[in-house]
C-alpha cells in the first residue's frame, strides 16, 4: 500500500507559525508491527477520561408505610430502617443512601433508599415488601422507576382497553378411545427412550399414533379415568390427550420426581426435591406460575382445568432429606371435595377448591402414624340410602407409655369419631378399605411379650351396620398381603409363619381364600357370620394378589424373584352337572412361569392380564406377556430395555341395572360377534371366508326383498263344516248273568 505525507503551515493564536505533518493511506498494520503498543502505558489517559458509573433510578426503592415521626426522632428511625434493609443489600454511604422527606417538623411516612446495584434493589422488594415493622406499620417497597413509570400522568392510559383473548383451541374429544367399535382398550409401551400408545389386539398391538422418541425423561402416567396422559421433563409436566395425543397443558415445576391425581381428575399433585425459587427478574417473574408465598416449597397441587397452581406446601421437617419418600403425601376423598396431609401429631384437612383448612384449624391426633379415606361414599346406619353418603376416614396411633394403640373412624366435616378400637402389643397396622366402603379391614401385626415372634390379627369394621360392629380374625401367621375382591365381602391373604427360618429358597407362604359363613333364618333371610377360609394353598413363593376389576378371577403372583410365577384362580367355579348353593368354590385354572417378572396389571374390562419385566429393576427377560383371564397366553414380547407397560383406565360404566341385565341376557349373541372378530383377526383366509359369506347373505336378502311381491297369492281354502257325533262313555259296568 502506498501512502503520502503532507506539510501544512498554520498560525496559532499568538501568530506563531506551526508546521503540522499529516499522513493518509498509511499502512497501519505495518506501523503496529514496528511500534509495540503493549509497552505503552495508558493508565494516565484511562484515569483522566474514566466515566463514572451512572447509578440510575433502578438502584432506588421507595418505602411507604413507615412511621410518621417528629424531626428529632427521624435519625433514630433512619438508623433502624437502615439496619433492616442492610440485611438484603449494601446501601450507599452518606446522606445519599437514605432520604426521608420532612414536612411541618415531622416525617411524611415514606423514604428513599439507594442501593449500590439494581439487583440489591430487586432483592429488597422481594424480601421486604409487605413486611411488618410493628403491629401498626407494614412496609410497602417499590422501585423508583416503577413510580415514575406508573405515577406520571399520561404514562398509564385512563381508558379501559379490552384484553385480547386468544382464540379457543380444541383438542378434540378427550374420551374418543371409548368410541372404538370393537370396544378395545389402549396400552402404553415404554422402551429405551421411546413411548407409544397402541390398541390392544389378541395377535399384536396396533399403533394409535407413531411411537415418539424422547416423549418423557422419566416415566409416563395416565390419569385415573384415562382422560389425560402425562409425561415428565426437567422443566415440569406435560399433559396430552385427544385422538392424536396432542399437547394440552404444561405445568412448570423443575425436576419433578413424583406425581399423583385426585380420583375425579380435577387436581394434579407434583413433588420435586428442588425448592421453588421465584425469579428476581420482573419479566421472568411475570410468566412464572408461583408467587413469593411459594418460595422454598416443594409440593404443588395444580388445577387441571386451568393448569394453574391451586396450593403449594413445604415438606414437613421430618420428611426433609429422606431418600425414600412416602407417597402420596396428599390423600383425597372419593369425590375430590376434601384432601388431607399428615403432619406431626395432626391432620391438615382442606376443602376444595379454596384449599383452606377445614374450619381454619388442624385436626389434632397425637402421634398419628397413617390415615386413609374411604374410597366411596359411606352409608351409615343413620344415613339416608338415597343421599350422597358420608365422607369418612380411618387412622391409627401407636402404643405409648400411658395408652394403647388405637384405630378410629372419623366423619368429615363434623370430625365426629364414629368408632374406636384399642389394640395391644402392636408392631404395625395397615388399613384396607373395600372398594364400596362397606368394610374396613385393619391388618394388625402384633408381637409376643418377648418381642421375638410376629403374628397378625384382622379387624373388620362393618361400616354400614348399626353401631359399626368389629369382627376379629386371629391368625398364627404374619399376613404379608391382603386384597378385597371388588364389590364383594370376600378376600385373599398371603401369610407365612414367623419361625425365624428365613431361607428364601424354601416355599413357606400360604394362600388363603376367605368369605363369611352364611346361614338362612326361618324366614328365609340370609345372615353372615364370622369369616372363614374356604380354601388354602400351602408351601408357595407367591407374594402378591391381583383381583380382576370385575371380581371372581384372581391372579396370585410371585414378583421380583428369579422364579416368577402367575397362578390364575376362579373363585366361583361351577363344575358341570354338579349343583351347589355355595359360590365359594376355588379352581386353579392355569399356572405360568415368568422369570424376572416385576409387575402385573389387569385391563379395565377384566379380560386380559399383562405381566412384564422392567429394565429399571433388572435386565432379566425384559419385555411383557399378555394373558387371558383364564391364563391362556396370547403374546410373549421380548423387548430390549423395556421399561413399563400401561393400561389406559376407563371411567365407570354409565349403564344402569336394566342395561346391564339386557347385556347379560344377550351375552351369547355378543360373544359370537366377538369370536367372529377374533377369528377374522387371527387368520387372513378365515377373514376372507367370513367376508364372502356376509356378502352372499346380503345379496340373498336383497334378492328376496326385491322379488317378494312377485310371488303368487295363496288361494283361500274352502272349508266345509261336517256334522260329527261323538260318543263318550261315562261309566262302564260289567254284570255276570247266570
Swiss-Prot record:
Domain of life per record: Eukaryota
GO biological process, one term: formation of cytoplasmic translation initiation complex
Protein name: Eukaryotic translation initiation factor 3 subunit B
Sufficient for interaction with HCR1 and TIF32, as annotated region: 1-120
Organism: Meyerozyma guilliermondii (strain ATCC 6260 / CBS 566 / DSM 6381 / JCM 1539 / NBRC 10279 / NRRL Y-324) (Yeast)
A GO MF term: identical protein binding
Span list, region Sufficient for interaction with PIC8: 1-245
CC per GO annotation: cytoplasmic stress granule; eukaryotic 43S preinitiation complex; eukaryotic 48S preinitiation complex; eukaryotic translation initiation factor 3 complex, eIF3e; eukaryotic translation initiation factor 3 complex, eIF3m; multi-eIF complex
Known role: RNA-binding component of the eukaryotic translation initiation factor 3 (eIF-3) complex, which is involved in protein synthesis of a specialized repertoire of mRNAs and, together with other initiation factors, stimulates binding of mRNA and methionyl-tRNAi to the 40S ribosome. The eIF-3 complex specifically targets and initiates translation of a subset of mRNAs involved in cell proliferation.
Subcellular location: Cytoplasm
Keyword Cytoplasm: yes
Major site of localization recorded for this protein: cytoplasm
Mapped WD repeat ranges: 211-250, 322-360, 363-406, 537-579
Keywords: Cytoplasm, Initiation factor, Protein biosynthesis, Repeat, RNA-binding, WD repeat
SMART domains given in the database record: RRM
RRM domain: residues covered: 59-146
Subunit relationships: Component of the eukaryotic translation initiation factor 3 (eIF-3) complex.
Family, as annotated: Belongs to the eIF-3 subunit B family.
Amino acid at each position: 500500500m502506498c501512502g503520502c505525507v503532507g506539510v501544512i503551515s498554520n498560525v496559532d493564536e499568538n501568530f506563531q507559525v506551526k508546521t503540522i505533518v499529516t499522513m493518509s493511506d498509511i499502512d497501519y498494520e505495518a506501523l503496529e508491527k514496528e511500534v509495540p503498543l503493549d509497552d505503552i502505558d495508558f493508565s494516565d489517559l484511562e484515569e483522566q477520561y474514566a466515566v463514572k458509573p451512572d447509578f440510575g433510578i433502578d438502584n432506588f426503592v421507595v418505602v411507604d408505610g413507615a412511621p410518621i415521626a417528629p424531626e428529632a426522632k427521624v435519625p433514630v428511625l433512619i438508623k433502624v430502617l437502615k439496619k433492616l434493609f442492610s440485611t438484603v443489600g449494601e446501601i450507599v454511604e452518606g446522606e445519599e443512601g437514605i432520604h426521608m422527606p420532612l414536612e411541618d417538623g415531622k416525617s411524611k411516612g415514606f423514604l428513599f433508599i439507594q442501593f449500590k446495584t439494581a439487583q440489591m434493589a430487586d432483592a429488597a422488594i422481594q424480601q421486604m415488601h409487605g413486611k411488618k415493622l410493628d403491629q401498626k406499620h407494614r412496609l410497602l417497597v417499590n422501585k423508583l422507576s416503577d413510580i415514575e413509570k406508573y405515577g406520571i400522568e399520561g404514562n398509564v392510559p385512563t381508558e379501559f382497553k379490552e384484553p385480547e383473548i386468544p382464540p379457543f383451541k380444541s383438542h378434540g374429544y378427550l374420551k374418543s378411545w371409548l368410541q372404538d367399535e370393537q370396544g378395545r382398550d389402549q396400552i402404553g409401551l415404554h422402551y429405551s427412550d421411546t413411548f407409544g400408545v397402541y390398541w390392544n389386539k389378541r395377535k399384536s398391538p396396533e399403533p394409535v399414533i407413531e411411537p415418539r422418541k424422547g416423549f418423557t425423561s422419566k416415566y409416563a402416567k395416565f390419569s385415573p379415568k384415562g382422560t389425560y396422559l402425562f409425561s415428565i421433563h426437567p422443566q415440569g409436566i406435560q399433559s396430552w390427550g385427544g385422538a392424536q395425543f396432542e399437547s394440552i397443558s404444561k405445568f412448570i415445576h423443575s425436576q419433578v420426581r413424583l406425581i399423583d391425581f385426585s380420583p375425579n381428575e380435577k387436581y394434579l399433585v407434583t413433588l420435586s426435591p428442588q425448592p421453588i425459587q421465584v425469579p428476581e427478574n420482573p419479566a421472568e417473574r411475570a410468566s412464572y406460575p408461583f408467587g413469593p408465598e411459594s418460595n422454598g416449597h416443594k409440593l404443588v397441587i395444580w388445577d387441571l382445568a386451568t393448569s394453574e397452581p391451586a396450593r403449594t406446601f413445604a415438606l414437613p421437617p421430618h420428611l426433609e432429606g429422606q431418600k425414600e419418600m412416602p407417597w402420596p403425601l396428599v390423600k383425597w376423598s372419593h369425590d375430590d371435595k376434601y384432601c388431607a396431609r399428615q403432619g406431626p401429631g395432626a391432620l391438615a384437612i382442606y376443602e376444595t377448591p379454596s384449599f383452606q383448612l377445614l374450619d381454619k384449624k388442624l385436626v389434632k391426633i397425637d402421634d398419628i402414624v397413617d390415615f386413609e379415606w374411604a374410597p366411596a361414599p359411606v352409608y351409615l346406619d343413620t344415613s339416608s340410602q338415597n343421599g350422597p353418603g358420608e365422607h369418612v376416614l380411618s387412622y391409627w396411633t401407636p402404643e405409648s407409655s400411658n395408652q394403647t394403640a388405637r384405630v378410629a373412624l372419623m366423619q368429615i366435616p363434623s370430625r365426629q369419631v364414629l368408632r374406636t378400637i384399642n389394640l395391644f402389643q402392636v408392631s404395625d397396622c395397615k388399613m384396607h378399605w373395600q372398594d364400596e366402603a362397606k368394610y374396613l379391614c385393619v391388618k394388625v401385626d402384633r408381637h409376643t411379650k418377648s418381642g421375638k415372634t410376629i403374628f397378625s390379627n384382622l379387624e373388620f369394621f362393618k361400616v354400614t351396620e348399626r353401631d359399626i360392629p368389629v369382627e376379629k380374625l386371629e391368625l398364627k401367621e404374619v399376613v404379608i398381603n391382603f386384597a378385597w375382591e371388588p364389590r364383594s365381602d370376600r378376600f385373599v391373604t398371603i401369610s407365612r409363619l414367623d419361625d425365624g427360618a428365613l431361607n428364601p429358597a424354601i416355599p413357606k407362604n400360604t394362600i388363603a381364600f376367605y368369605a363369611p359363613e352364611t346361614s338362612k333364618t326361618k324366614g328365609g333371610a340370609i345372615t353372615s357370620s364370622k369369616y372363614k377360609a374356604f380354601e388354602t394353598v400351602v408351601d408357595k413363593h407367591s407374594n402378591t394378589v391381583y383381583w380382576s376389576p370385575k371380581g371372581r378371577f384372581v391372579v396370585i403372583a410371585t414378583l421380583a424373584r428369579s422364579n416368577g410365577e402367575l397362578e390364575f384362580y376362579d373363585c366361583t367355579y361351577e363344575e358341570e352337572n354338579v349343583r351347589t348353593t355355595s359360590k365359594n368354590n376355588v379352581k386353579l385354572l392355569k399356572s405360568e412361569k415368568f422369570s424376572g417378572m416385576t409387575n402385573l396389571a389387569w385391563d379395565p374390562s377384566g379380560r386380559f392380564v399383562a405381566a412384564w419385566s422392567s429394565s429399571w429393576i433388572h435386565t432379566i427377560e425384559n419385555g411383557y406377556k399378555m394373558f387371558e383371564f383364564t391364563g391362556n397366553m396370547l403374546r410373549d414380547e421380548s423387548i430390549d430395555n423395556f421399561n413399563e407397560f400401561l393400561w389406559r383406565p376407563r371411567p365407570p360404566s354409565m349403564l344402569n341395572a336394566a342395561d346391564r341385565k339386557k347385556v347379560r341376557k344377550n351375552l351369547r349373541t355378543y360373544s359370537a360377534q366377538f369370536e367372529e372378530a377374533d377369528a377374522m383377526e387371527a387368520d387372513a383366509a378365515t377373514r376372507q371366508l367370513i367376508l364372502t359369506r356376509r356378502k352372499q347373505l346380503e345379496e340373498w336378502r336383497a334378492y328376496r326383498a326385491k322379488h317378494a311381491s312377485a310371488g303368487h297369492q295363496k288361494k283361500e281354502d274352502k272349508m266345509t263344516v261336517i256334522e260329527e257325533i261323538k260318543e263318550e262313555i261315562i261309566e262302564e259296568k260289567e254284570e255276570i248273568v247266570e
